[in-house]
Amino acid sequence: MMNNEHDNFQKEVETTTETTFNREEGKRMVRPLFKRSKKYCRFCAIGQLRIDLIDDLEALKRFLSPYAKINPRRITGNCQMHQRHVAKALKRARYLALVPFVKD
Protein backbone atom coordinates (compact mmCIF):
# COMPACT_ATOMS: atom_id res chain seq x y z
CA MET A 1 0.00 0.00 0.00
CA MET A 2 2.08 2.84 -1.27
CA ASN A 3 0.98 6.45 -1.18
CA ASN A 4 1.51 9.01 -3.90
CA GLU A 5 3.76 10.87 -1.47
CA HIS A 6 6.24 8.01 -1.64
CA ASP A 7 6.16 7.96 -5.44
CA ASN A 8 6.75 11.70 -5.67
CA PHE A 9 9.49 11.71 -3.04
CA GLN A 10 12.86 12.57 -4.57
CA LYS A 11 16.30 12.38 -3.04
CA GLU A 12 18.43 15.48 -2.95
CA VAL A 13 22.04 14.99 -3.95
CA GLU A 14 24.73 17.00 -2.25
CA THR A 15 28.23 17.19 -3.70
CA THR A 16 31.33 17.37 -1.54
CA THR A 17 34.21 19.19 -3.18
CA GLU A 18 37.96 19.34 -2.74
CA THR A 19 39.99 22.46 -3.51
CA THR A 20 43.38 21.87 -5.12
CA PHE A 21 46.02 24.28 -6.36
CA ASN A 22 47.30 23.97 -9.92
CA ARG A 23 50.97 25.07 -9.89
CA GLU A 24 51.29 25.39 -13.66
CA GLU A 25 48.48 27.90 -14.11
CA GLY A 26 48.54 29.37 -10.61
CA LYS A 27 44.79 28.82 -10.19
CA ARG A 28 42.70 27.01 -7.66
CA MET A 29 40.68 24.11 -8.99
CA VAL A 30 37.60 22.59 -7.42
CA ARG A 31 36.83 18.99 -8.16
CA PRO A 32 34.06 16.86 -6.69
CA LEU A 33 35.17 14.08 -4.33
CA PHE A 34 31.95 12.11 -4.28
CA LYS A 35 28.20 12.60 -4.40
CA ARG A 36 26.40 12.07 -1.12
CA SER A 37 22.68 11.44 -1.35
CA LYS A 38 20.51 12.91 1.34
CA LYS A 39 19.09 10.17 3.54
CA TYR A 40 15.42 10.12 4.35
CA CYS A 41 13.19 8.10 6.60
CA ARG A 42 11.44 5.53 4.41
CA PHE A 43 8.66 5.12 6.97
CA CYS A 44 7.87 8.85 7.00
CA ALA A 45 7.92 8.88 3.19
CA ILE A 46 5.10 6.33 2.98
CA GLY A 47 3.28 7.71 6.01
CA GLN A 48 3.63 4.57 8.12
CA LEU A 49 3.30 5.34 11.81
CA ARG A 50 3.40 1.88 13.37
CA ILE A 51 6.23 -0.50 12.61
CA ASP A 52 5.68 -4.21 13.10
CA LEU A 53 8.42 -5.92 11.15
CA ILE A 54 8.29 -9.30 12.88
CA ASP A 55 6.13 -10.67 10.04
CA ASP A 56 8.67 -9.54 7.42
CA LEU A 57 12.08 -10.83 8.55
CA GLU A 58 13.92 -9.79 5.38
CA ALA A 59 12.88 -6.17 5.94
CA LEU A 60 13.94 -6.51 9.57
CA LYS A 61 17.39 -7.87 8.70
CA ARG A 62 18.03 -4.83 6.49
CA PHE A 63 18.52 -2.79 9.69
CA LEU A 64 21.18 -5.17 11.08
CA SER A 65 24.94 -5.04 10.54
CA PRO A 66 26.86 -8.15 9.39
CA TYR A 67 27.54 -8.86 13.08
CA ALA A 68 23.80 -8.73 13.94
CA LYS A 69 24.03 -5.33 15.64
CA ILE A 70 21.38 -2.67 15.08
CA ASN A 71 22.59 -0.07 12.58
CA PRO A 72 22.47 3.55 13.81
CA ARG A 73 20.28 6.31 12.37
CA ARG A 74 23.09 7.86 10.35
CA ILE A 75 23.40 4.63 8.37
CA THR A 76 19.73 3.63 8.04
CA GLY A 77 18.44 7.16 7.43
CA ASN A 78 15.48 6.73 9.77
CA CYS A 79 14.09 9.54 11.86
CA GLN A 80 14.41 9.31 15.64
CA MET A 81 10.90 8.00 16.25
CA HIS A 82 11.05 5.28 13.59
CA GLN A 83 14.56 4.25 14.61
CA ARG A 84 13.23 3.58 18.12
CA HIS A 85 10.36 1.52 16.67
CA VAL A 86 12.79 -0.48 14.51
CA ALA A 87 15.04 -1.12 17.53
CA LYS A 88 12.08 -2.33 19.60
CA ALA A 89 10.92 -4.61 16.77
CA LEU A 90 14.44 -6.06 16.45
CA LYS A 91 14.68 -6.64 20.18
CA ARG A 92 11.29 -8.37 20.14
CA ALA A 93 12.43 -10.56 17.24
CA ARG A 94 15.62 -11.45 19.12
CA TYR A 95 13.59 -12.44 22.17
CA LEU A 96 11.37 -14.65 19.98
CA ALA A 97 14.51 -16.22 18.43
CA LEU A 98 13.66 -14.98 14.93
CA VAL A 99 16.91 -13.00 14.67
CA PRO A 100 20.20 -14.00 16.33
CA PHE A 101 21.69 -11.90 19.11
CA VAL A 102 25.24 -12.28 17.76
CA LYS A 103 26.60 -13.74 14.54
CA ASP A 104 29.38 -16.27 14.95
From Swiss-Prot:
GO cellular component: cytosolic small ribosomal subunit
GO molecular function: small ribosomal subunit rRNA binding; structural constituent of ribosome
TM region(s), chain numbering: none
Region described as Disordered: spans on this chain: 1-25
Basic and acidic residues: compositionally biased ranges: 1-14
Keyword RNA-binding belongs to the record: yes
Pfam family, one: Ribosomal_S18
Gene3D superfamilies: Ribosomal protein S18
Keywords linked to the UniProt accession: Ribonucleoprotein, Ribosomal protein, RNA-binding, rRNA-binding
GO biological process, any: translation
SS bond list: none
The keyword rRNA-binding is assigned to this record: yes
Function statement: Binds as a heterodimer with protein bS6 to the central domain of the 16S rRNA, where it helps stabilize the platform of the 30S subunit.
Family: Belongs to the bacterial ribosomal protein bS18 family.
PANTHER family: 30S RIBOSOMAL PROTEIN S18, SMALL RIBOSOMAL SUBUNIT PROTEIN BS18M
NCBIfam families the UniProt entry points to: S18 (TIGR00165)
Quaternary structure (record): Part of the 30S ribosomal subunit. Forms a tight heterodimer with protein bS6.
Protein name: Small ribosomal subunit protein bS18
Organism: Mycoplasma pneumoniae (strain ATCC 29342 / M129 / Subtype 1) (Mycoplasmoides pneumoniae)
Lineage: Bacteria, Bacillati, Mycoplasmatota, Mycoplasmoidales, Mycoplasmoidaceae
